[in-house]
């Protein structure tokens, strides 16, 4: 059986799956890749990089461009939400102290229940909205 190789040359060599094999430069027995690369050097894998070995363990450095936690004002740390992370990256972050104070009062109101939120026109917290949708009356 005669096949036409990659460069139009007639060849009758086939690999184990029946695909034609081009015999260039004395190399024999290698399959042709999907992009025409002979079985030599088709994949460019690098076993080690600059002599560094990690033994399959992912290592992270201790530094990062933005912290995922901040001081909670009571001597501890708390995780930042997505909103705080975005605000931190935006220009004009001079209102950090005012935003921190406002957020603390909003969090206290959010989890405190429905103490006058409808009468004073304040925004309802997430927990209040969820509680309204639950069956079984007002909690």
Swiss-Prot record:
Residues 23-42 have a biased composition (Gly residues). One of its GO terms (cellular component) is cytosol. Induction: By abscisic acid (ABA) and water stress. InterPro entries: Dehydrin, Dehydrin_CS. The keyword Endoplasmic reticulum does not apply. Residues 1-139 are annotated as: Disordered. Residues 49-58, 83-98, 120-139 have a biased composition (Basic and acidic residues). It comes from the Eukaryota. One of its GO terms (biological process) is response to water deprivation. Residues 59-68, 99-109 have a biased composition (Low complexity). Keywords: Stress response. PANTHER family: DEHYDRIN, DEHYDRIN XERO 2-RELATED. Belongs to the plant dehydrin family. This is Dehydrin DHN1. It comes from Hordeum vulgare (Barley). The gene is DHN1.
């Amino acid at each position: 059986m005669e096949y036409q190789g990659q460069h139009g040359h007639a060849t009758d060599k086939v690999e184990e799956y029946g695909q034609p094999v081009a015999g260039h430069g004395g190399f024999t027995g290698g399959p042709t890749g999907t992009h025409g690369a002979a079985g030599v050097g088709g994949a460019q894998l690098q076993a080690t990089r600059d002599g560094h070995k990690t033994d399959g363990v992912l290592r992270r450095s201790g530094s990062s461009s933005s912290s995922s936690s901040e001081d909670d004002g009571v001597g501890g740390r708390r995780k930042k939400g997505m909103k705080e992370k975005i605000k931190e990256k935006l220009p004009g972050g001079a209102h950090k102290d005012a935003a921190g104070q406002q957020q603390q009062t909003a969090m206290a109101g959010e989890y405190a229940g429905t103490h006058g939120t409808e009468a004073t026109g304040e925004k309802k917290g997430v927990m209040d909205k969820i509680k309204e949708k639950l069956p079984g009356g007002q909690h």
